């Protein structure tokens, strides 16, 4: 007698439930997808104890025929497909016929439905078996109640997370449905409390306001585009609205929420250097395509998909994001609330200091001495600013300068420490010019006012006040300069009087052949000198002054990223060089140098962020300043 046996339906359904029904969120997802497939325009989800105790999904869809009530709980019973051709032309969210059978095998289910105005029907299913069937009063549509989830699979129940975590998972999937199907009214109620309520008016941007809040929704940028095979529509947030993970990036194909690494990569390439390292944008993009071009039958959850002509879709998404995002004003404005919080904290600290001073009964003489010291610093600073103003050429005589009180008296000792002599300034600003077209400025004209802490340039125009990070500004300028030079096929080289010697380990020497193509592309030619030593006799003329350190870092980077493509290596090289060569914090500049820096920045391709994605310019509008000082209410 053989030992291989056919499992009965109860056991096989519980096995299938292990893949399909992982947690309460899985039940909610499957039931809501069925409601959407039933052409519902209103769907209400009610959960108790994060769905473990009870999940009820009510819709106003087409309802279920009487003869289908019991059949719907059989495994692989579905109304969505009939043959193999249908499997590759799926337009519905559900199609596998596994979900309801899996749910019924690990819970107690009640279905109440009314189809096309007929008499209502009700059926109770426990452990996959029908235990009751009767007539019932019911509105048009279907109501499915799932109770005691995982009551008969204690091992699965043991690994369910906290109620807070599970409710968060349910909220997340409903948020995706709200965005993907804005024409459906969704309501999520948890333990009697309404968590989500969309209006179902068909507008994706308003649906995103329900999920992400009005402030972000108002700052969204719409993207639209199509090719012969794909149509893309959605909304993307400006780079100032980012998150620490990809959780806020929603991709949909024909309304189905999916996860796809290559499409995510295309999105990030569209933002390019606008995003800070480790930050991700907020967006929702729906892709409409022929179902024959997408295979959703990859995993029971149906979130992983395989795409035909994937590279074309990637190019379309990347191009649309680039075209839209770079047309926006990407200078972030300061939030009044955050500024006020800072002021209030400073006031609190000042009040504590004053209270302490009163308790210790500090003498009036001590207080006056402190005031005098500050006054002397201000006078010295003002004197320095006047000296600098005298050095400015006639053409710059109209520039205004303002002194800022320094925390350290040592910074105020001499004029040269605050404003370097001309040869120092020119060394700081050298080689930052790019050959970028000068036809159009990307940032507004502004008048330099001064500098704070040798780090931030203060400027103004009729629209308000601007703060510019001088390091980030020059980093952007140099990045575009170096990137252009590195991409030049005719590299102009200079011979070194003393060759650079590089010593590699055995492992590095073995892998050297793999990275030589990368190094040669940017003008680094390693010649074997003996043993593990290599020499470099020539470098490109545009290489930074500290070329030995730069060369070593580039070799190290290439060895660590041997699989990197050529374009990515060029970009990383430009980023590395621009960062090291740019002026740093606590470096004081002349007004003329600040003007030159801003003028160069204005004509870069992307003047809003440094290559690492940090903002370069922040704006305080005149209205915001007036509100801070209570000039307007």
From Swiss-Prot:
Q: Which UniProt keywords apply?
A: DNA damage, DNA repair
Q: Which domain of life is it from?
A: Bacteria
Molecular function in Gene Ontology: ATP binding; ATP hydrolysis activity; ATP-dependent DNA damage sensor activity; mismatched DNA binding
InterPro entries linked to this entry:
DNA_mismatch_repair_CS, DNA_mismatch_repair_MutL, DNA_mismatch_S5_2-like, HATPase_C_sf, MutL/Mlh/PMS, MutL/Mlh/Pms-like, MutL_C, MutL_C_dimsub
- Pfam families with a match to the protein in the record: DNA_mis_repair, HATPase_c_3, MutL_C
Q: Name one GO biological process term.
A: mismatch repair
Instruction: Provide GO CC annotations from the record.
Output: mismatch repair complex
**Function (record text):** This protein is involved in the repair of mismatches in DNA. It is required for dam-dependent methyl-directed DNA mismatch repair. May act as a 'molecular matchmaker', a protein that promotes the formation of a stable complex between two or more DNA-binding proteins in an ATP-dependent manner without itself being part of a final effector complex.
PANTHER family xref list:
DNA MISMATCH REPAIR PROTEIN MLH, PMS, MUTL, DNA MISMATCH REPAIR PROTEIN MLH1
Entry's family note: Belongs to the DNA mismatch repair MutL/HexB family.
Q: Protein name, please?
A: DNA mismatch repair protein MutL
Organism of derivation: Macrococcus caseolyticus (strain JCSC5402) (Macrococcoides caseolyticum)
Q: Which gene is annotated as encoding this protein in its UniProt record?
A: mutL
């Amino acid at each position: 007698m053989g030992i291989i046996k056919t499992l009965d339906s109860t056991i096989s359904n519980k096995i299938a439930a292990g893949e399909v029904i992982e947690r309460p969120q899985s039940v909610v997802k499957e039931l809501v997808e069925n409601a959407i497939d039933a052409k519902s325009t209103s769907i209400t989800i009610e959960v108790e104890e994060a769905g473990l105790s009870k999940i009820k999904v009510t819709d106003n869809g087409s309802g279920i025929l009487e003869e289908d009530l019991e059949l719907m709980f059989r495994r692989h019973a579905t109304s969505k497909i009939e043959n193999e051709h249908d499997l590759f032309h799926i337009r519905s969210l559900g199609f596998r016929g596994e979900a309801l059978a899996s749910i019924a095998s690990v819970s107690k289910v009640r279905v109440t439905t009314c189809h096309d105005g007929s008499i209502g029907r009700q059926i109770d299913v426990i452990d996959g078996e029908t235990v009751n069937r009767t007539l019932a009063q019911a509105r048009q549509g279907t109501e499915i109640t799932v109770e005691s989830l995982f009551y008969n699979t204690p091992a699965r129940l043991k690994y369910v997370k906290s109620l807070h975590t599970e409710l968060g998972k349910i909220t997340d999937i409903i948020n995706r449905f709200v965005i993907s199907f804005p024409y459906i009214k969704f309501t999520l109620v948890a333990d009697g409390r309404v968590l989500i309520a969309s209006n179902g008016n068909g507008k994706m941007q308003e649906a995103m306001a329900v999920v992400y809040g009005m402030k972000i929704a108002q700052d969204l940028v719409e993207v639209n585009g199509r090719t012969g095979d794909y149509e893309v529509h959605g909304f993307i947030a400006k780079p100032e609205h980012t998150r620490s993970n990809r959780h806020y990036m929603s991709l949909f194909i024909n309304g189905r929420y999916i996860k796809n690494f290559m499409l995510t990569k295309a999105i990030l390439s569209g933002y390019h250097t606008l995003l800070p390292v480790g930050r991700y944008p907020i967006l929702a993009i729906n892709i409409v395509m022929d179902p024959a071009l997408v295979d959703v039958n990859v995993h029971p959850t149906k979130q992983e998909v395989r795409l035909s002509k994937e590279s074309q879709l990637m190019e379309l998404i990347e191009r649309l994001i680039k075209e839209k995002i770079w047309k926006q004003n990407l200078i972030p404005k300061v939030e009044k609330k955050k500024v006020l919080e800072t002021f209030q904290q400073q006031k609190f600290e000042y009040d504590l200091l004053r209270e302490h001073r009163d308790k210790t009964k500090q003498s009036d003489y001590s207080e006056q001495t402190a005031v005098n010291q500050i006054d002397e610093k201000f006078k010295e600073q003002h004197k320095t600013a006047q000296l600098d103003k005298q050095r400015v050429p006639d053409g710059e005589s109209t520039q205004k300068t303002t002194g800022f009180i320094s925390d350290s008296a040592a910074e105020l000792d001499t004029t040269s420490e605050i404003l370097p002599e001309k040869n120092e300034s020119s060394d700081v600003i050298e080689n930052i010019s790019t050959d970028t077209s000068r036809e159009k400025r990307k940032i507004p004209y502004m008048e330099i006012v001064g500098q704070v802490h040798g780090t931030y340039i203060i400027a103004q125009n009729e629209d308000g006040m601007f703060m510019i990070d001088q390091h980030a500004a020059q980093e952007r300028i140099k990045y575009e300069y170096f990137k252009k030079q590195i991409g030049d096929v005719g590299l102009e080289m200079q011979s070194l009087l003393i060759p650079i010697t590089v010593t590699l380990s055995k492992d590095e020497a073995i892998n050297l052949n793999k990275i030589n193509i990368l190094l040669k592309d940017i003008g680094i030619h390693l010649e074997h000198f003996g043993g593990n030593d290599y020499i470099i006799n020539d470098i490109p003329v545009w290489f930074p002054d500290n070329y030995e350190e730069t060369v070593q870092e580039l070799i190290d980077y290439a060895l660590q990223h041997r699989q990197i493509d050529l374009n990515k290596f060029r970009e990383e090289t430009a980023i590395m060089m621009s960062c090291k060569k740019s002026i740093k914090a606590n470096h004081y500049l002349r007004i003329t140098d600040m003007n030159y820096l801003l003028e160069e920045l204005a004509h870069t391709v992307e003047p809003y962020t440094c290559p690492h994605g940090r903002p370069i310019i922040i704006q305080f509008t005149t209205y915001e300043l007036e509100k801070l000082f209570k000039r307007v209410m």
